[in-house]
């Protein structure tokens, strides 16, 4: 800890990550002088004290805390969503826990009484609790409940009805109908052994654990929907109909009563009868069973007894003669260790890939003898190494088919080992074959690798360096992969025996290294190989091991099958105990469709893909996830299904109706490929920016009030000719559809707000006025041939994309392209009709300075250093003889790249880019390159005397900044120059003031030139760039995240940063928000602030394009900035502003503390309202509020009558708000999660429905309710702190008044009470 403090004092820009784990000691937050606003997951699992906890009250969402002292009010962060207090066992009092939290109290065993737990808790783990529960003790919203030690009587109503996942593994009290919640789907009653009657178990149960149950079961006792049942102790007679027809997994491990046909349901896929030894005849076992365990069976099997669908078969005790075809043909894995009968070739099917038999009397294999080493082994090739960790390992490997034979080893005179191995002529490292394997071969190789690692582990060996380079593939003489045993594992340099493993493993491949090896936490073992195996499988299928999620786990490629994805996912678990071992992994691959009940687990990962998930949903399982993909899920969902925090949601197979409020308001990207139900108002969250359908094809008049996102992709199915006229206006900016048009498009199909229209299957004529004038970018079909109709395009279009498949030459199309179109993409290529296409590859002629590409120092005079670029310095130099490339040009700019830096870049990068741009007037002319005698690289470009960089000009300016008019004038030239660079097919990727040069052309006009193309990239069709390159202070978010979205818009982000530079702000030391977006100088006009803001958008689709930025800069008016300009007076304190124009950044003075916006109803951009406002009043506002829309300074907030707090107020979490007024007409009981925790005066003057327990924040002292409040009994749920209450009733009902007064008398804390505005005693 002291080192952290000292490091912080040395460097004030110390960065706190989003995930913090402290492993021991005492945590003192007092040394942090920075905000912990980025910390989302905080692991304090070994800390035993807390000091200054308010330092992280607001920002931590996931807290793991080993804390045994009494919790006091305010100790825990207010907005924690998942809280691990697994060691806590002190008494809770109301208000000590956060208002909405997933809670782990594994050690807690103090008495709970009603009201001690927040009503919003939906995940509760009380695995040590064994005190009697009474009805109302547990919150009604509970979905996951773990009471694994509980064994007190339960009565109907004790458990919350919404519970879906229930663990009562110690419970053995009599259950009666209605005791278990009706909605429960997973029930663990491992210890239960009381008689069950029909209707005791709820009908919705799908997973049922009754592992101790041995009472007689009768038809109807088990629910009809059960899919998985554990009856591992059951040994009473089963009759037909006892087990439900839908069951797929049955564990009858102890059962040994005679089975008759139809006793077992035909749909069973996994059947465990490990004690069964009664005669089996054809028709007894289910026809669809795939996994069959009859490991005690030793009666004669005949052909037809076992189902043809069996793939995994355990016959561990079987030793009767096996006739041909007795074992089904589909069996892949067969366990027969007791079998000692004679074998013929037809005994086992050809598909059996894993066969375990006993030692056969005729089995002899002399090939496994160790041959003593000789001094010369001429007939074998020899591998030589200086490393040899343990000879015993190599001795053991001589009996393992998946490793090379060892011939021996000797020490030479230098005491180094010479190890002699088998050499196989037809063996190729897997790393050299990756691009040649098809999908089927990839899976076959993966299965064989798993099998080989299983063999190594069974011999007690841990490899520690599994990767493609250490795996050999064996081929036959025809260069075809051997049918079996074609894998050889090599590279045992780091290996150890299991009995000798230690935590100090060094030198293994970092990209494949398991977390426990990096952490040296003592958890090394066989599971470390499983992690490396997962990384190797990603290698095999073409994945990139450098692409990691927030926890450092490699991302699994999307194109894989569900089985392949799940196999890798079972390998790449942070916790070694959660990984499969090699045997489990091999069995999983062989019997991929076996269903097992999986307990919902805590997932802090921000990126989660559950390809096969289609069962019980537990919200706590999704806490912390920002990216959630469920490929197979197709069940109805409700509002608690997905945790509020998910930003990217993909429901690949989902096709059920969506109601208002079902999906959380945090979602920004929503993909519903299979969805085809009517959309209702509020069914698509307002936070969604990007919405993708594929099969959606309906719209009605009821949907015209929908607010749809800015980017909408309808896919191929949506009939835009039929429904297009009903699409809501004014919200969609980008519209994408693959509909195949039957007639020319009509502009009434397209909303007037759309600026980017993508009709990628439109190949018909374009009629006059058929495309709206709002369109700036247009994409047409891949076989568009009506070129003459392009003249009908509106003049607003500047970007056009289309394709064609006929014999037209692109050059012939020039006459059809309207002059207002500046960017053209044809068949995936950017076309420039104004100039001949630049050279495409570096291999073409480059007019180099020297034919042999050599650099001689004596030929050059270095005049001065111009600067340092990426990977090299740049010098101003003179050629001694005054001739460069045959011309009389003496001055030159030379970039020197050291040999060591040359390894970081490819020569073909900067040289090829410069060569490609040699005819582009906005880059320095390229002369050539050369190497000196030390192999340093020199790149020669034009030098223009008198030229200067933007950064040098900034230094010469007063206060080191340009005036706005100067920035505007220069930026128009800079962006136009950038458009020419992009037209040449190049993205710069490192634009900043240092790399922009101003020079004079022949006409003495200022011309912009870009330099330092060392990090540039050529634009290619369908390219996704993942490289982490550029200057950090100017780097776009998508480049830092390496998410494949980097492209030409990344240069626009750099332009925005450069404008900030020119305005006088040092980006290296500027403040940034949570997404890394730099702050904008406050002295700029609102118009300029908004231009920069639109360059710095996190979402690349929302960012300016080159074309739109040129237009916006050209139209900007520096003076008379906006209607708000007159309100910038620093002396103005109180302001009533009657306007409905969007409020721009900085448009309202920072001294205003009272702000009234009576008619305002626009989105409030975070930061638009001044940070000085304390009193904020609205009347017409009804827009979604983002996290920072309301300044932290606001103490009094009046939301007026229009604001729908149920839909738009989820982020209303300011701790500063003390008084909140809202006239919203609630349709359902208010929830604490909608109200600021800090409110003391709450005025809900149109609230006339019932109150629920814990629905009002505990700090509220003054409460105002509606004018027709009749739910009198619910007033008993008021918090204890309320001392002032005002309500209204109609018609002065005396009876109602007396009832109210009677309840108020029980609330001793209430000292002031009003009905209809009249004070009551």
Swiss-Prot record:
The record places the active site at 465 (proton acceptor), 990 (proton acceptor)
Report the domain of life of the source organism: Eukaryota
Cofactor(s) required for function per UniProt? Mg(2+)
Describe the location of the Protein kinase domain by residue ranges: 295-595, 860-1128
Q: Main EC class of this protein?
A: transferase
Q: Where does ATP bind?
A: 301-309, 325, 866-874, 895
The UniProt record lists the keyword Lipid biosynthesis? no
Entries under Pfam families matching the protein: FNIP, Pkinase
Catalytic activity annotation: L-seryl-[protein] + ATP = O-phospho-L-seryl-[protein] + ADP + H(+); L-threonyl-[protein] + ATP = O-phospho-L-threonyl-[protein] + ADP + H(+)
Molecular-function GO term, any one: metal ion binding
Q: Please report the residue spans annotated as repeat (FNIP).
A: 108-149, 150-191, 192-233, 255-296, 654-696, 741-783, 1160-1202, 1224-1268
Please name the InterPro entries in this protein's record. FNIP (IPR008615), Kinase-like_dom_sf (IPR011009), LRR_dom_sf (IPR032675), Prot_kinase_dom (IPR000719), Protein_kinase_ATP_BS (IPR017441), Ser/Thr_kinase_AS (IPR008271), STK_FNIP-Repeat (IPR051251), WD40_repeat_dom_sf (IPR036322)
Q: Which UniProt keywords apply?
A: ATP-binding, Kinase, Magnesium, Metal-binding, Nucleotide-binding, Repeat, Serine/threonine-protein kinase, Transferase
Q: What is its EC number?
A: 2.7.11.1
Membership in a protein family: Belongs to the protein kinase superfamily. STE Ser/Thr protein kinase family.
This one is known as: Probable serine/threonine-protein kinase fnkE
This protein's species is Dictyostelium discoideum
């Amino acid at each position: 800890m002291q080192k952290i403090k000292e490091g912080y004092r040395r460097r004030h820009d110390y960065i706190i990550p989003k995930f913090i784990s402290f492993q021991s000691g005492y945590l003192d937050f007092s040394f942090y002088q920075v905000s912990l606003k980025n910390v989302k997951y905080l692991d304090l699992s070994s800390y035993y004290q807390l000091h200054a906890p308010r330092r992280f009250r607001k920002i931590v969402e996931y807290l793991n805390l080993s804390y045994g002292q009494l919790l006091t009010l305010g100790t825990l962060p207010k907005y924690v969503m998942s809280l691990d207090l697994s060691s806590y066992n002190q008494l809770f009092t109301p208000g000590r826990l956060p208002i909405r939290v997933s809670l782990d109290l594994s050690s807690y065993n103090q008495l709970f009484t009603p009201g001690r737990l927040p009503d919003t808790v939906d995940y509760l783990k009380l695995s040590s609790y064994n005190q009697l529960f009474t009805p109302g003790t547990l919150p009604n919203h509970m979905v996951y409940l773990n009471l694994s030690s509980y064994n007190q009587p339960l009565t109907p109503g004790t458990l919350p009805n919404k519970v879906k996942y229930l663990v009562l593994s110690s419970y053995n009290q009599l259950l009666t109908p209605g005791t278990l919640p009706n909605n429960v789907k997973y029930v663990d009653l491992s210890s239960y052994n009381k008689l069950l009657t029909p209707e005791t178990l709820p009908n919705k149960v799908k997973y049922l654990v009754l592992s101790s149950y041995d009472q007689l079961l009768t038809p109807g006792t088990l629910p009809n929907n059960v899919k998985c049942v554990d009856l591992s102790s059951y040994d009473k007679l089963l009759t037909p109909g006892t087990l439900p027809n839908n069951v797929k997994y049955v564990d009858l491990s102890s059962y040994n009563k005679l089975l008759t046909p139809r006793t077992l349901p035909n749909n069973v896929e996994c059947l465990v009868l490990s004690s069964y030894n009664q005669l089996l005849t054809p028709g007894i076992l289910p026809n669809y069973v795939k996994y069959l365990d009859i490991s005690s069976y030793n009666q004669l099997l005949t052909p037809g007894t076992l189902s043809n669908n069996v793939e995994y078969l355990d016959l561990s005790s079987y030793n009767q003669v096996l006739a041909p075809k007795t074992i089904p043909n589909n069996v892949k894995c067969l366990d027969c260790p007791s079998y000692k009968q004679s074998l013929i070739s037809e005994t086992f099917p050809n598909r059996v890939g894993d066969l375990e038999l006993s030692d056969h009397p005729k089995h002899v294999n002399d090939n496994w003898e160790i041959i003593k080493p000789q001094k010369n082994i001429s007939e074998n090739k020899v591998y030589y190494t200086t490393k040899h960790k343990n000879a015993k390992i190599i001795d053991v490997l001589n009996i393992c088919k998946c490793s090379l034979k060892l011939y021996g080893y000797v020490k030479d005179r230098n005491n180094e080992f010479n190890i002699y191995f088998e050499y196989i002529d037809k063996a190729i490292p897997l790393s050299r074959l990756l691009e040649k394997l098809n999908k089927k071969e990839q899976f076959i190789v993966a299965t064989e690798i798993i099998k080989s690692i299983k063999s190594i582990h069974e011999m007690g060996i841990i490899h520690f360096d599994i990767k493609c380079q250490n795996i050999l593939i064996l081929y036959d003489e025809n260069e075809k992969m051997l049918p079996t045993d074609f894998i050889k594992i090599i590279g045992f340099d780091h290996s150890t025996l299991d009995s000798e493993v230690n935590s100090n493993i060094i030198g293994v491949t970092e990209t494949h290294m398991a977390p426990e090896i990096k952490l040296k936490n003592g958890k090394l073992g066989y599971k470390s190989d499983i992690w490396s195996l997962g990384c190797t499988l990603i290698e095999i299928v073409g994945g990139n091991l450098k692409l990691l999620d927030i926890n450092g786990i490699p991302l699994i490629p999307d194109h894989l099958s569900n089985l392949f994805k799940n196999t890798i996912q079972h390998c790449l678990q942070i916790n070694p105990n959660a990984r499969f071992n090699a045997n489990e992994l091999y069995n999983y691959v062989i019997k991929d469709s076996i269903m097992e009940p999986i307990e919902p687990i805590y997932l802090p990962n921000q990126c989660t893909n559950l390809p096969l998930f289609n069962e019980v949903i537990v919200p706590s399982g999704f806490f912390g996830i920002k990216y959630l993909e469920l490929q197979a899920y197709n069940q109805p969902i409700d509002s608690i299904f997905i945790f509020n925090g998910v930003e990217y949601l993909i429901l690949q197979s989902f096709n059920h109706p969506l109601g208002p409020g079902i999906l959380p308001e945090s979602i920004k990207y929503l993909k519903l490929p299979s969805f085809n139900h009517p959309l209702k108002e509020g069914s698509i969250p307002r936070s969604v920016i990007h919405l993708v359908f594929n099969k959606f094809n309906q719209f009605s008049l009821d949907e015209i009030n929908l607010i749809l996102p800015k980017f909408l992709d309808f896919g191929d199915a949506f009939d835009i000719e039929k429904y297009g006229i009903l699409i809501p206006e004014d919200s969609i900016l980008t519209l994408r559809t693959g509909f195949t048009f039957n007639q020319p498009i009509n502009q009434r199909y397209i909303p007037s707000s759309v600026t980017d229209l993508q009709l990628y299957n439109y190949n018909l004529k374009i009629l006059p006025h058929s495309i709206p004038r709002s369109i700036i970018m247009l994409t047409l079909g891949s076989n568009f041939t009506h070129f003459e109709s392009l003249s009908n395009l509106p003049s607003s279009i500047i970007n056009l994309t289309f394709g064609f498949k006929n014999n037209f030459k692109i050059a012939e199309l020039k006459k059809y392209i309207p002059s207002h179109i500046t960017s053209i993409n044809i068949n995936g290529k950017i076309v420039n009709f104004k100039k001949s296409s630049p050279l495409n590859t570096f291999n073409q002629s480059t007019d180099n300075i020297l034919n042999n590409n050599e650099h001689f120092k004596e030929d050059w005079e270095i005049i001065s250093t111009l600067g340092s670029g990426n990977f090299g310095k740049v010098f101003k130099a003179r050629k001694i003889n005054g001739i460069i490339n045959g011309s009389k040009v003496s001055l030159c700019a030379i970039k020197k790249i050291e040999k060591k830096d040359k390894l970081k870049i490819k020569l073909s990068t900067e040289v090829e880019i410069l060569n490609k741009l040699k005819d582009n007037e906005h880059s320095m002319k390229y002369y050539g390159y050369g190497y000196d005698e030390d192999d340093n690289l020199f790149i020669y470009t034009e030098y223009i005397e008198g030229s200067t960089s933007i950064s040098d000009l900034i230094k010469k300016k007063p206060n080191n900044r340009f005036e706005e008019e100067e920035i505007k004038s220069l930026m128009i030239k800079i962006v136009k120059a950038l458009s020419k660079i992009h037209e040449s097919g190049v993205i710069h990727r490192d634009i900043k003031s240092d790399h922009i040069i101003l020079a004079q052309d022949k006409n003495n006009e200022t011309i912009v030139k870009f330099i330092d193309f060392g990090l540039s990239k050529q634009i290619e069709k369908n390219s996704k760039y993942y490289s982490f390159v550029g200057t950090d202070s100017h780097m776009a978010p998508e480049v830092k995240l390496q998410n494949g979205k980097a492209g030409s818009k990344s240069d626009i982000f750099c332009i925005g940063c450069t404008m900030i530079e020119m305005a006088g702000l040092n980006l290296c030391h500027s403040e940034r928000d949570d997404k890394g977006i730099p702050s904008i100088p406050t002295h700029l006009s609102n118009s300029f602030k908004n231009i920069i803001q639109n360059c710095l958008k996190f979402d690349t689709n929302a960012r300016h394009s080159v074309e739109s930025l040129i237009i916006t800069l050209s139209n900007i008016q520096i003076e008379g900035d906006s209607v708000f300009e007159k309100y910038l007076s620093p002396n103005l304190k109180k302001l009533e502003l009657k306007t409905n124009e969007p409020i721009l950044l900085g448009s309202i003075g920072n001294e205003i503390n009272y702000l009234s916006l009576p008619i305002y109803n626009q989105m409030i951009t975070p930061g638009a309202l001044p940070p000085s406002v304390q009193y904020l009043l609205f009347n017409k506002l009804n827009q979604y509020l983002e996290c920072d829309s309301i300044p932290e300074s606001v103490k009094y907030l009046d939301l007026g009558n229009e604001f729908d707090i149920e839909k738009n107020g989820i982020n209303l979490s300011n701790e500063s708000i003390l008084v909140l007024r809202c006239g919203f007409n609630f349709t359902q009981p208010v929830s604490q999660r909608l109200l600021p925790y800090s409110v003391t005066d709450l005025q809900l003057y149109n609230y006339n429905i019932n109150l629920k327990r814990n629905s009002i924040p505990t700090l509220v002292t003054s409460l105002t309710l509606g004018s027709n409040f009749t739910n009198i009994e619910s007033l008993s749920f008021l918090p204890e702190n309320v001392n002032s209450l005002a309500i209204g009733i109609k018609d002065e009902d005396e009876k109602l008044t007396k009832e109210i007064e009677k309840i108020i008398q029980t609330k001793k804390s209430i000292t002031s009470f009003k009905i209809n505005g009249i004070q009551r005693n």
